Amino acid sequence: GHQLVNAALGGHNMLNFPRKHAVEHSEGIQHEIVAEEGSILNRLYGPKLLVNSFHRDCADAVGPDVKVTARSLDGIIEAIEHKTLPVFSVQFHPERMRGDAPNPAFGPDGTELFKYFVDLC
């Protein structure tokens, strides 16, 4: 989803990015990301948060009306927001960050991001 939104907004994606960043699908893989001040993620969760990793592809350039709002510590784009439209996307899977089976209990509750999305609609 994240890569599709990025491409639709004029961005470019890297498929099968370098192995040092790629993570096999498995339970409990996590990493820290840094959310930009004023971003949706920063307002909901603060400047740093733990998220899951279930990806081999990533956004590597965003369109002209899009801003990068979070990155992993190794520089992977983890969140984007359109500058004027109510459109945002994240690399991770917030639906798997609820602390209920089979979702591992770490980091913030991803439900808050869904609530934000529903309120935005």
Regions found by a protein language model. Name each.
Residues 9-12, 121:
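A generic secondary-structure signal for well-formed alpha-helical elements
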Residues 17-121:
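Amide-donor transfer/coupling interface in amidating biosynthetic enzymes
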